[in-house]
Amino acid sequence: MAKYDKADLERRMKGAVESLRGDLSGLRTGRANTALLDPIVVEVYGSHMPLAQVATVSAPEPRLLSVQVWDKSNVTPVEKAIRSAGLGLNPISDGNTLRLPIPDLTEERRKELAKLASKYAENARIAIRNVRRDGMDALKADESKKEISEDERKRAETDLQKLTDDIIKQADEAAAAKEKEILGK
């Protein structure tokens, strides 16, 4: 069992929150956001490449994404990848540029996305709690090896719990903000 390392535990907890923020940024909210297309992979040149490696994505208007494909021969595969990504977007081809109007979300779809945001947040909370458990186990192991006293362990556990609560609060705030954005409240 590894020694208790608060900095490492904090880094891992913050990593879970950053991962949550990344997941949340990929949820469509009815407004153009370039992160929406980040997970799209395009099959070009005989291999699968992220969209960002074959095109430039921008949001020139609040309800429009623009995908500037660098190589004209890749326009069709990029268009196909966007259509098949399940985002409900229909690219409009304009030479090397694909325009993606962002349609309004239906109330039903908004609720689905809000549930998905909640699920992402719960997964982040679980990851954070798992990190806390690892820290608690390390503290108990250190105490059993007589490397720290019982008082030091309890003090460190209290600190770790406070850190966990703070990080979970950050995750909850990120999810709540995204849900509010999705539901348009």
Swiss-Prot record:
Responsible for the release of ribosomes from messenger RNA at the termination of protein biosynthesis. May increase the efficiency of translation by recycling ribosomes from one round of translation to another. It comes from the Bacteria. Pfam families: RRF. CDD domains: RRF (cd00520). One of its GO terms (molecular function) is ribosomal large subunit binding. Keywords: Cytoplasm, Protein biosynthesis. It is found in: Cytoplasm. Belongs to the RRF family. It comes from Novosphingobium aromaticivorans (strain ATCC 700278 / DSM 12444 / CCUG 56034 / CIP 105152 / NBRC 16084 / F199). This is Ribosome-recycling factor. SUPFAM superfamilies: Ribosome recycling factor, RRF.
